Amino acid sequence: QRQMCIRDSILNTHYIHTDRLMSEMVATVAQTMSYVIAILCFYLMHVSSFPERMKNGINYIKKHWKFLIVMFIISICASKAYEWIMELLPQSWQFNETQNELALNQLFKTPLFLPITFILIVIVGPIVEEIVFRHILIGELGKKFNFIFMGMVSAITFSLIHVSGAKSPLEFGAYFILAVILVFVYLKSNRNLASSITIHILNNLLSFMITIYTISM
């Protein structure tokens, strides 16, 4: 009877683990599809001007790639400096990873998730977030409320969205640094969406590669 209980316990644990993985997979696919639909809607709303937007975006990246690389490096250095400052604070204030990062890390633990996780985190995620937080909040609403003011709103809301489940208020700073740089690049480029998308994709690509390397060690 004891052996049966142990067997049932193992089977139940297996089923729970499988169900959780399936739920995470479904949620990841659903989120990816919703992002793809959002990008498609953006395209349909700007279908007449989209080719010109794409051309301008590509031309900007070609012409100002050095500026974009410099800003990307600055974002990395600023983030590392923030992490270093966090290490000087009392232990109770510190955090190793943000709650958002911990949640995303679950997707990396199953190889089956990696292709869809890459698409979600590195490609469609940054594009959708830049459409919402830069194009809509700054590019569109900025025409009515002032671009600088909406840039501040964009940086704050972007950071808050990513720390909604945070256990430490200091997690806000980790995302605010990236948000400020994305806003600056977007405004500096005369609101060229390709500029901030490029920085955002590079940032997420680096995080993706580091996570893969860390998990494989």
Question: Which residues make up each language-model segment?
Answer:
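Structural signal for the C-terminal ends of transmembrane alpha-helices
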Residues: 42-52, 185-189
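Juxtamembrane/transmembrane-helix boundary motifs at the membrane-water interface
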Residues: 7-30, 211-217
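Alpha-helical transmembrane segments
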Residues: 36-40, 75-83, 180-183
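Short, small-residue-biased leader/transition segments that mark boundaries at the very start
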Residues: 2-6
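Juxtamembrane helix-loop-helix connectors linking adjacent transmembrane helices
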Residues: 16-24, 51-125
